[in-house]
């Protein structure tokens, strides 16, 4: 039977519970255990698919088409285990399912309440689908004391009593702030956070304390005494230079050993940290550096591009170079020459996005890369803008546009209304709901033999994750091919363009899918490895 590790947070939000969960999962894997990581999000949205990137950050898409929390990206990158729809649930999804059951009469006239109906639904979600696993790590979003999180805390409290003895532990991630004027770390916020947690019936087994400096013995002793945990269970989670050093840092601090001790697993098998050491060796000893411009719409919140940032770093790991990112808001290009902002960079990446704001700036970035022969990588919306720019400039159709921005007589990009998934026709209406109605998840694509994209993949059949409701119009295919831009990747039915590239350019590729979602530090995505390699070549010319 699986053992359960519940990870909660306190004092402040954005402490890194997702990263801590992922790192612990990686450490348990390194000891030979099988793990699954799951996330409970207390917000009332069904999923984060319609939430602003400025509020939620990135929407991480799974192979099975779920729009989930960005922490699932950490889980995948650290453990290599693909996440699925049922690794993430929200209060909104739970309430929707409960209300649907109530309307059907499934509760036989009972008064539907938070306890037991909501808490039972949460417990059922946590316990389902874990057969054959050694450990299930469950992260609870938000911080202890949040009103919306109370049903989740109550559910995991009940599970602590209902699971067999020795099959559930609680880890509380907290912050030890340093007060310069006092010259010391303060433990009182953590004490109050644990007091709040204990008031709802949860006694943490381990305190994982975020800090920028070593925890003195006296503070460690004080935390153990007033938080009712053993001193050895007060784990120092020191800041590190790279997130990929977190597994090693947590192992050195004794987190994985303390977790196994809390479960009574002795002696514990030694972890194999070789692949993490290999990754850090490349990060710590770069043989060069490149600068990549990210021309985006949500650059004010870097979490909106979390997987993209990590995938670029993976490309750097593969090529033994440091990747410096130059964040550029695409709107600043509109009506101006982008050259002063882009002449110094070695590669230009235009990521996904929605809506007309900043679209013209993205097209100008694509034009600059095309004309100056700078490596260009367009992803999803970025590919669409590159195609529109090519139709306007090369095919001499200045009114070319996307129907996403309004009616147009030259719809180079249009709304998808029909596509195939698993041999079934999927249909969407233009006036339908926005949530969950895009082309989501893994879809196959066929690559043209002899194309640059096929050379990069080393294959002509691939599967990648998608998140879009607009597509490039194949009616412009021949006109673009005459100008050097080819559709080098298509859906199996030949109707949906998946990849475009310029044949006479050192590296100009646009993809409709999101390759960043499948990149790993120890298995960099080939597109990002190739893009960074092209940027290295460009760095020798600039």
UniProtKB/Swiss-Prot annotation:
Catalyzes the ATP-dependent amination of UTP to CTP with either L-glutamine or ammonia as the source of nitrogen. Regulates intracellular CTP levels through interactions with the four ribonucleotide triphosphates. The keyword Transmembrane helix does not apply. Residues 291-541 form the Glutamine amidotransferase type-1 domain. Pathway: Pyrimidine metabolism; CTP biosynthesis via de novo pathway; CTP from UDP: step 2/2. CTP binds at residues 13, 146-148, 186-191, 222. One of its GO terms (biological process) is pyrimidine nucleobase biosynthetic process. Residues 1-265 are annotated as: Amidoligase domain. GO terms for molecular function: ATP binding; CTP synthase activity; glutaminase activity; identical protein binding; metal ion binding. GO terms for cellular component: cytosol. CTPSs have evolved a hybrid strategy for distinguishing between UTP and CTP. The overlapping regions of the product feedback inhibitory and substrate sites recognize a common feature in both compounds, the triphosphate moiety. To differentiate isosteric substrate and product pyrimidine rings, an additional pocket far from the expected kinase/ligase catalytic site, specifically recognizes the cytosine and ribose portions of the product inhibitor. Homotetramer. ATP binds at residues 14-19, 71, 238-240. It catalyses: UTP + L-glutamine + ATP + H2O = CTP + L-glutamate + ADP + phosphate + 2 H(+); L-glutamine + H2O = L-glutamate + NH4(+); UTP + NH4(+) + ATP = CTP + ADP + phosphate + 2 H(+). Disulfide bonds: none annotated. This is CTP synthase. Belongs to the CTP synthase family. Keywords: ATP-binding, Glutamine amidotransferase, Ligase, Magnesium, Metal-binding, Nucleotide-binding, Pyrimidine biosynthesis. UTP binds at residues 13, 186-191, 222. It holds the Pfam family GATase.
